[in-house]
């Protein structure tokens, strides 16, 4: 989905990129999709059309990716537990985001993850849950999500999906899980694929294969398997191994 295109009806309105979800250390796909979007907006020279909200530790990094972007910062919680972080994100999205919308003339809000606040905003919102495995795969092998976390996430996703105007699924697996567990919101889902970014020379001489890399997936169909295959495809001519 081209979020910038949603703004064409009113050029004075801006997009709020809600990046309050970014971790101190890169957390994989959850963070990368946000970075990819910001880089894309920067390359299209649309920096004046967006405002970024984040915890203060992410400010310098985001400004490096997109020089000139307007960045609004919030101080992170002093304690770093999962529950404290989740509650603080809910606080920011429930009370601070509406103020940012009014002050910066925001027309669309993009949430880079879940936990989007306890009330529906007055402007359209787009969100990416990334996956709902705490609900859909409570038990995976020897790992089991605690019952209170299961209930918390089950309610949180329901509230987020109810308030969102569009829900972005990063893969067919994510889309089918959301449709299965939250069927009433299936018409809001838009599926995309978040590409990885690897710099490889355009012309690479083939290398004779000397062995194999074996990848085993015994859990369930997941976008990470697609990412693995695509990543290997990009470097296949650089190494002397085949992927099985």
Predicted regions: what they are:
Residues 2-244:
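Carbohydrate transferase catalytic cores enriched for Leloir-type hexosyltransferases
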């Amino acid at each position: 989905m081209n979020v910038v295109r949603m703004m064409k009806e009113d050029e004075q309105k801006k997009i709020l990129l809600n990046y309050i979800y970014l971790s101190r250390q890169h957390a994989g796909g959850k963070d990368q999709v946000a970075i990819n979007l910001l880089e894309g907006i920067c390359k299209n020279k649309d920096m004046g059309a967006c405002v970024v909200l984040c915890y203060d530790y992410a400010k310098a990094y985001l400004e490096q990716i997109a020089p000139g972007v307007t960045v609004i910062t919030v101080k992170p919680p002093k304690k770093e537990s999962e529950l404290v972080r989740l509650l603080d994100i809910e606080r920011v999205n429930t009370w601070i985001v509406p103020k940012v919308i009014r002050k910066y003339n925001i027309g669309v809000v993009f949430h880079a993850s879940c936990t989007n606040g306890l009330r529906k905003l007055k402007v359209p919102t787009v969100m990416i849950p990334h996956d709902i495995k705490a609900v859909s795969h409570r038990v995976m092998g020897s790992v089991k999500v605690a019952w209170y976390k299961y209930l918390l996430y089950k309610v949180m996703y329901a509230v987020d999906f109810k308030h969102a105007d569009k829900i972005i699924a990063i893969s067919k697996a994510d889309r089918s899980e959301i449709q299965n567990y939250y069927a009433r919101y299936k018409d809001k889902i838009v599926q995309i694929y978040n590409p990885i970014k690897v710099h490889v020379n355009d012309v690479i001489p083939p290398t004779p294969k000397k062995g194999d890399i074996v990848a085993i997936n015994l859990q369930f169909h997941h976008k990470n398997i697609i990412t693995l295959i695509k990543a290997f495809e990009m470097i296949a001519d650089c190494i002397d191994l085949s992927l099985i």
